[in-house]
Amino acid sequence: NTRCLGSFVFLWGQKEERTPTWFSMFVEDKVDSLPLKGEKTPMVEAMQRVWTGKELDETAPIVRGMTIDGKSAIDNVRIKAGTLFKAEVSVTDKENDSLAYVWEVLKEATVLGFGGSYEPRPERMGDVAVSDKNVYETMIKVPGEYRLYVYVLDNTGFVSTANIPFQVID
């Protein structure tokens, strides 16, 4: 449109999106035990493409879906406390880069901000797992509401993320 004078990307001031991965241009870079360095998300790639009109030589991995025991988020995943469960993420990468998978389970957010107010990062359950596999197994012994996150990193500075909420029941 010839009437468009330009565009810009902005940040509210701090993260307030219920999860550490929603609507981010870059992933976190200073979180204990997470091997993340502020890698670029697909939104950075999209903005570069829109602003330059050119395809990039390197692109972010594409997450096609994520399941826990074969169920997606829409299936209201429930797991019995102390039961081993298996998560799987389906990913493609246009350039066939080698991929690394970083998995973590966080408690579901309970401190919810409003209108851009600060929300603390939810508490982590267990250890961060780093692997070259798109499959992750773990168990949670304490009933409650949780969210499993995966960060899929290529070797070019891009990352894609997915998460799935689940409930652990007695």
Identify the role of each PLM range.
Residues 92-96, 143, 155-157:
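Short solvent-exposed strand-capping/beta-turn motif centered on an Asx-Ser/Thr pair
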Residues 1-114:
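Substrate-binding clefts and catalytic carboxylate motifs of secreted carbohydrate-active enzymes
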Residues 165-170:
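Short beta-strand edge segments in extracellular beta-sheet folds
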